[in-house]
């Protein structure tokens, strides 16, 4: 683990209110999401001397950071926990998975409408519901809808060319409009209307209509039909009982603000159709002397106006600050949306409670952030002492990733006095070298990064070279040959070689390519910050390499599964009604397809899920 998590300092910042917490590992990945009636009491239980299970011990050993979101009630905490688990798919949760390109659920305008996920411009005829936080949330919702309201989700090309119903019909997840006589036009249209109402947040109307139909069927002695509708009613109720819904079904964003020690936190609650979908904290960079009103006004403008093509504005925005140009802001947003957008600063009732909640979350997140910042400062001070530098304000670290020499990617990550500066992370595609030549790759990325004009504020104090003596020698050669206007002698070049068995804490550091290196104690704060930036660089390189490799393959997810050739692909898609139906199918359902064994069904299931 790159850093020792200071549980004692963190717990001092935690409230005793109900809420949800997210635990992160050293790579910034959410590894656990939980809920609590009392956040302080629950989180304190993780750091006792005697833990409940080995799983908890393994979890706690990997904790790098914890974020909390305060909620009004336990019910809200339950909903939020569920949303976060679907979003992050944490490793230590029982799994039931921020996308700038917000996906929608699309209900087509066909004679027999279909449901599908949609991204981008809304050209196709039909209705769009959303936005959803990410693609996984859409797929989960589509799978849920398919179980409750069995309208088709297959591609039109599949739908138009069927002579008999697919497996989705056989297992009760599609009414089979592709084959004449399986479902009446009226029944299919009714199910489509239920979907429309459900996605619009009108769950009560759906239940009212279903109950009425069930009673009518029962009175007409159509007991089988009444039982089917009863099951549908129960399915809808199971879903709606888990959701916290406000008295109004409006769409609104609630923005709370906290400011302390020169740092601001803006916390946004996202509420759609009266349901809390989630929340997020933002920490805008605040120049000295800036008024808080300017921070809020600038943030709101950037948040809604940048990337506006992919962002859907809510009908109302609640602000934790009385802005001088509130009318101007509302008019600008209304013009952008093509409809009236209200910006309110003094709400009442439920809206006032939401604003108080956003304010509480902003203050909690800011307190936690300031505590983390203090820890980073201590580690950088310790590193400066080890390296005999006056201070370390900026560090950059490089790593190389490839597969058997192909699709080589170099990463550069940046840390400043506050820790990771992710907006300045960069990836470089390496070309024109001998496959697998990491030295040439390092040489190339350093020349591209530093062989140009650099602003004085962007000159690093330390450049960390992951790979030991050989890579450090490349860096020294590159810097010796640089012909630049900035002070190329300012950065200290530091090589890092992994220890025996590549275990954290056994790293060897090098100032020069020749001679012996030196090591730091495993509990050294200076070593922790070196491990942290090194791990960030490695993860960033691996992530870039995976994207490049996936792009090069340019094949469907089915084509990558061993044992699934063209005939089996065709059979799977035919019986499941397309790839979406296959993604939503269980192992048992996949195994029913002719030619697919239980073992292959499991392989297909997990390949599509991951």
UniProtKB/Swiss-Prot annotation:
GO function terms (MF aspect): DNA binding; excinuclease ABC activity
Compartments reported by the entry: Cytoplasm
UniProt keyword Disulfide bond, yes or no: no
Residue span, UVR domain: 204-239
A cellular component annotation (GO) from this entry: excinuclease repair complex
Pfam families in UniProt: GIY-YIG, HHH_5, UVR, UvrC_RNaseH, UvrC_RNaseH_dom
SMART domains attached to this UniProt entry: GIYc (SM00465), HhH1 (SM00278)
Domain GIY-YIG: 16-94
Source organism, top-level taxon: Bacteria
Biological processes per GO annotation: DNA damage response; nucleotide-excision repair; response to radiation; SOS response
Gene3D superfamilies, per the entry: 5' to 3' exonuclease, C-terminal subdomain, GIY-YIG endonuclease, UVR domain, UvrC, RNAse H endonuclease domain
Keywords: Cytoplasm, DNA damage, DNA excision, DNA repair, Excision nuclease, SOS response
Database matches in InterPro entries: GIY-YIG_endonuc, GIY-YIG_endonuc_sf, GIY-YIG_UvrC_Cho, Hlx-hairpin-Hlx_DNA-bd_motif, RuvA_2-like, UVR_dom, UVR_dom_sf, UvrABC_protein_C
Predominant cellular place of this UniProt entry's protein: cytoplasm
PROSITE patterns assigned: GIY_YIG, UVR, UVRC
Role of this protein: The UvrABC repair system catalyzes the recognition and processing of DNA lesions. UvrC both incises the 5' and 3' sides of the lesion. The N-terminal half is responsible for the 3' incision and the C-terminal half is responsible for the 5' incision.
NCBIfam families: PRK00558.1-5, uvrC
Family: Belongs to the UvrC family.
Subunit structure: Interacts with UvrB in an incision complex.
Identification of the protein by name: UvrABC system protein C
Organism of origin: Escherichia coli (strain K12)
